[in-house]
């Protein structure tokens, strides 16, 4: 059981390309659910195999804007950005105190393909954010995951549909906090 008074670092990983209103709302909800925990955004670096990431410095700056709104318990970690070779979530989490990793149910779908699976599932705790069309319990009942079921906690949160890809496809500022939208305009980002 993930106790609310555990001293822990909650780590929210992702590309944050760009960070959206959904990322902010998820962070706020998780921080509210675990008021004694430190909260870290963990953006992936360029060594990660995701294409189309804007420069790390811009993603870090935009995440700092989210942290200003979230308050002093939140911070941005640049450990994966500093890594020249992506080593995976397993090794990143080892750098935090009693870590709990936040992931969307859409990312839970492929957890068996993560570097260092099953160790990452066996040795860590996770807060899973529901996503439309993803049956979290069915995933956690898979043979490869069911013995780690107690390490996964499903956060009761309303459906938030504001993905970074939706912003990149539409350039609609409704997906962003105003200060992030302003930063994007000032720095001429996501023009393609």
For each of these PLM feature ranges, what is it?
Residues 1-192:
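Nucleotidyltransferase catalytic core that binds NTPs
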């Amino acid at each position: 059981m993930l106790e609310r008074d555990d001293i822990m670092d909650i780590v929210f990983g992702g590309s944050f390309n760009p960070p959206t209103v959904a990322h902010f709302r998820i962070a706020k909800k998780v921080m509210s659910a675990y008021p004694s925990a430190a909260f870290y955004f963990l953006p992936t670096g360029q060594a990660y195999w995701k294409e189309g990431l804007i420069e790390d410095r811009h993603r870090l700056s935009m995440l700092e804007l989210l942290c200003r709104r979230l308050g002093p318990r939140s911070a941005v970690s640049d450990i994966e950005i500093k890594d020249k070779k992506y080593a995976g979530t397993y090794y990143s989490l080892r750098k935090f105190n009693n870590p709990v990793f936040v992931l969307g149910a859409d990312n839970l779908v492929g957890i068996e393909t993560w570097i260092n699976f099953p160790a990452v599932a066996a040795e860590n705790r996770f807060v899973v954010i529901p996503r439309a069309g993803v049956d979290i319990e069915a995933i956690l009942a898979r043979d490869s995951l069911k013995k780690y079921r107690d390490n996964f906690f499903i956060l009761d949160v309303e459906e938030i549909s504001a993905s970074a890809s939706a912003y990149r496809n539409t350039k609609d500022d409704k997906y962003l906090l105003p200060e992030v939208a302003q930063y994007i305009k000032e720095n001429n980002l996501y023009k393609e």
